[in-house]
Structure formats: structure tokens, C-alpha cells
């Protein structure tokens, strides 16, 4: 990591703000003119995420939805009347992106379930998200309401209803569905299990013609290598463990995931480098969702999972349903501890192999489900990636600039630079030293709206009340004891 203190000077213009006391105008304008919707992060350490470096003692000025100035504190003036955020000893990085979550019913209002998910995401520093499932009408409605400024939440990209063996019957219907979903305004397609090869190929061909990315699961009929050749982005490492088995092993035909069973003993990790290199060459993105699978196979047991502090923000009915689901999945929960460990370790090895080969990773939580609470689950996934051997910068990259690049928006957000959308995360400690520091949040800015620690705590409290949780004494975002700055 390089530590830098200088940067090309830019004009100190201002940027957007969501807090009381907006400022006055930039000095280049008449002093009497107000610098409306302007906020300056003063004397802050910037983690720009354009490379592995740290810019010490910077001032970052934001106006509207954009960063308009970034430079050394002694050379970057703060517009007169701009709202100032103290940055000394703090770290400013791009907001996080959850590239695999599910929306729930609602319109995005604070009192409904969808609104609660939005609040939990923001309170944990997630300013962009990709929804890969949820009620058909909810996803586009909430996405558009956020975009219009009617409700506050991360910028959303939403997938169409999943294409699978029950929703499409044959190649022609697959093509028709793709055209329908494009016309309906969905941002991408999701594929699930049980698609035959011919139907899959028709879907992928039409998706390319319509300019829609496809993400999702890998079925035995399709296979990992054909999915890679087709350009599908892969969720959950689907198909990778299957490919670690000997060529003639019947367990290769299990749908997407070889679970915690006897076939694990026959897997050959020596196959991982070739799989990773094939992924890199194909330019395919992967969202491993390590934390979800490690939660499901956790040796600590369901009762321990029920003590997670973030469950305060989940409805008790959801917690009970998750408990029952794990209790009913005997293969996952009753497997020997050694087999669970091997399952988790093989997934870590595949993920580490992908990173080492230069294949692109994304952070995806697959929340809210199975003790994975929206927002909080992003931090669990980042920490799981770190535990898999991905260095801090690589994890942060997967959670920021990689997501923007995957969506074709690398010049819009995902880094801290002049002209970028002001989706920012202000931290109390350096995330390049430990990704756990992304939990220690002093404030979040989403599209130029500033949410200080006090407002994030208020959002969490409102969510907890709706979830019928008891009041909390110590406030914080991703830990139960972090305090407001």
C-alpha cells in the first residue's frame, strides 16, 4: 500500500448534503451567494480505491450528487458556508455494494419491510445493491422510487423473475421471456436450476441481443465450463465443487452445489487453478456468498446463530422460520464437523484460487435469509473473503470498484475521485489494515445525502421498533457496542 499526501489540485466546488445547516458559496463566486447543498470532509484520509494507496490529510468537497474537489487540506479551500465534516483521524472510502440480495414486499417506506431493508443497508454503509429476487412488482417499484428521491436507499439494479425449468418451456419461450423482461425495464436476468442446455443457450443468445447480463446458478445440463463460455456471472460458486470431482463421478450431476456429503472426500483441490484460469479467461464475475454457506454449516449450531446481535433487526417470525429450515436440513446440520469444515475450506480455496488467477470477485450477501440480516451480512461476507485469504484491498475492491465495473459504471461510482457520484463511507479506522474496520462507521453519504452516525442510529432504532425488538443501550451499526462519534 502506498501512502500519498499530494494529488492534482482541483477547483474547490461543493456537493450535496442531507443534514441541517447547508453552507454558502464557493469563494470564486460572490461571497454573499450561498453554497447550497455543499459538504466538505476536512483533513480526512482518503482510500480512493483506484489502486492500493492512502491519501493522507485531504479535503473532499461534494455538491449535488458529485465529488467536485479532492486535494491536500492546505491546498483545497472549503467553500464559504459549506457544511464541514471533521475528517482528522478518519478514513473516507467509496460506499459498499451488495451484489446479491433479495428485496421483500413493500414500497420502500420506513415502516414497510422493503423500507427496513433499505435502512439496514444504508446503516451498514451499503450505497449500491443488486437485487436478484423478490416480489415481481416490488423490485422495480422500489428501485424507481429510490431513483426519484421518493424514498431513501442505495442505488438499486434489479433482476427479472428467475428463468428456470418451470417458468420457461423451451427455447422460443425463453427468448420471448427475455424480450418481455427487457421491455418491462429490468436491469438483468437471473437463471435458476433445471434449465436444459438448448433452452439455456436460447436465453443467453437473446440476452446478448437485448444487452442484458445474466447471473445465477449452474445446472448439470449446462455445466460450469459452458456457463463460463456463455458469459454467465456465477452465484454461490455453483458448479465449481462439482468440477473438483473425478471425471466419471456421478455426484457431478448434483444441481449446482455438492453439499455436505460423502462426495467431498473425493474432491481434488489440485483442479482449482485450471478452473480459476478458465474463469479469468472467460471474463466471468463470481459472487461466492461464503458467509451464507458458512452460516448454514456453522459448527456453533443454530442456538448460537440465534444470539447474533443483528437479529435485533429481524422479525422474530423470520428467526423462527430460519431455525426450522436449518433443523429440517439434516444433511447440512447433522454432518460430521470434519465434513462441514472441508466443505467450507474447499469453497475458500476456490475463492482464493479465483482471486489469485485474476478472476473478478463481487461481494454478495444473499440476504435477508438464514440469519443473514441485510447490511450486516455484507460485513460478514467481507470478513469471510478475508478469512479465505483475500487481502484487505482485494476484499474492498470486490465491495466497491468491482461492482461498478461489473455494471458498466466504473466512471460513475466505486472510487473516490472528482466527478464520481458521492457514495461515501466515513470510518474511524483504516480498512486497508483490516476489513473489519468497515463496521466502525462515522457516517454514510448516498448520492450526496449525508447521514451522520446519529441519523444512522435513529434509522436502526426505527427498524428495531418495527421488528418488535427490545431497546438497545449501546448504539452502533455493525456491532452492538460501537458508539456515535
PLM segments and residue spans:
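C-terminal motif of bacterial Sec signal peptides marking the signal peptidase cleavage site
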Residues: 20-21
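Histidine-rich, glycine-flanked metal-binding segment
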Residues: 26-37, 46, 51-93
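Divalent metal-coordination and catalytic microenvironments
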Residues: 44, 60, 65, 89, ...
Amino acid at each position: 500500500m502506498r501512502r500519498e499526501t499530494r494529488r492534482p489540485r482541483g477547483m474547490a466546488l461543493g456537493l450535496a448534503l442531507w443534514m441541517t445547516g447547508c453552507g454558502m458559496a464557493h469563494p470564486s463566486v460572490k461571497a454573499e451567494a450561498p453554497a447550497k447543498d455543499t459538504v466538505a470532509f476536512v483533513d480526512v484520509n482518503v482510500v480512493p480505491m483506484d489502486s492500493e494507496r492512502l491519501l493522507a490529510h485531504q479535503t473532499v468537497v461534494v455538491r449535488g450528487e458529485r465529488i467536485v474537489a479532492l486535494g491536500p487540506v492546505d491546498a483545497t479551500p472549503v467553500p464559504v458556508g459549506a457544511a464541514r465534516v471533521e475528517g482528522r483521524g478518519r478514513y473516507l472510502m467509496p460506499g459498499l455494494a451488495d451484489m446479491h440480495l433479495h428485496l421483500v414486499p413493500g414500497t420502500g417506506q420506513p415502516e414497510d419491510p422493503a423500507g427496513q431493508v433499505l435502512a439496514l443497508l444504508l446503516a451498514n454503509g451499503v450505497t449500491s445493491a443488486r437485487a436478484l429476487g423478490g416480489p415481481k412488482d416490488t423490485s422495480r417499484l422500489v428501485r424507481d422510487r429510490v431513483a426519484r428521491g421518493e424514498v431513501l436507499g442505495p442505488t438499486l439494479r434489479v433482476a427479472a423473475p428467475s428463468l428456470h425449468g418451470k417458468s420457461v418451456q423451451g427455447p422460443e419461450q425463453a427468448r420471448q421471456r427475455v424480450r418481455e423482461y427487457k421491455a418491462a425495464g429490468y436491469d438483468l436476468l437471473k437463471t435458476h436450476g433445471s434449465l436444459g442446455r438448448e433452452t439455456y443457450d436460447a436465453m443467453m443468445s437473446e440476452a446478448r441481443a437485448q444487452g442484458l447480463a445474466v447471473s445465477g446458478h449452474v445446472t448439470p445440463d449446462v455445466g460450469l465450463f459452458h456457463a463460463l463460455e456463455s458469459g454467465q456471472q456465477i452465484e454461490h460458486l455453483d458448479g465449481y465443487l462439482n468440477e473438483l470431482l473425478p471425471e466419471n463421478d456421478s455426484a457431478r450431476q448434483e444441481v449446482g452445489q455438492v453439499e455436505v456429503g460423502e462426495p467431498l472426500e473425493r474432491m481434488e483441490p489440485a483442479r482449482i487453478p485450471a478452473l480459476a484460469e478458465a474463469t479469468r479467461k472467460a471474463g466471468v464475475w463470481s459472487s461466492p456468498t461464503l458467509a451464507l454457506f458458512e452460516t448454514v454449516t456453522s459448527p456453533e449450531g443454530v442456538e448460537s446463530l440465534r444470539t447474533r446481535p443483528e437479529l435485533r433487526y429481524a422479525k422474530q417470525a423470520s428467526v423462527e422460520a430460519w431455525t426450522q429450515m436449518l433443523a429440517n436440513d439434516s444433511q447440512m446440520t447433522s454432518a460430521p464437523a470434519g465434513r462441514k469444515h472441508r466443505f467450507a475450506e474447499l469453497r475458500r480455496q476456490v475463492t482464493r484460487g479465483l482471486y489469485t488467477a485474476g478472476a473478478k470477485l463481487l461481494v454478495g450477501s444473499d440476504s435477508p435469509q438464514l440469519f443473514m440480516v441485510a447490511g450486516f451480512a455484507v460485513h460478514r461476507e467481507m470478513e469471510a473473503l478475508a478469512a479465505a485469504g483475500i487481502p484487505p484491498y482485494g476484499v474492498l475492491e470486490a465491495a466497491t470498484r468491482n461492482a461498478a465495473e461489473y455494471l458498466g459504471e466504473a466512471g460513475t461510482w466505486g472510487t473516490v475521485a472528482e466527478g464520481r457520484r458521492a457514495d461515501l463511507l466515513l470510518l474511524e479506522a483504516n480498512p486497508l489494515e483490516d476489513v473489519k474496520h468497515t463496521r466502525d462507521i462515522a457516517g454514510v453519504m448516498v448520492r450526496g445525502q449525508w447521514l451522520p452516525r446519529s441519523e444512522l442510529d435513529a434509522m436502526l432504532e426505527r427498524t428495531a421498533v418495527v421488528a418488535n425488538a427490545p431497546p438497545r443501550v449501546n448504539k452502533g451499526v455493525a456491532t452492538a457496542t460501537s458508539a456515535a462519534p
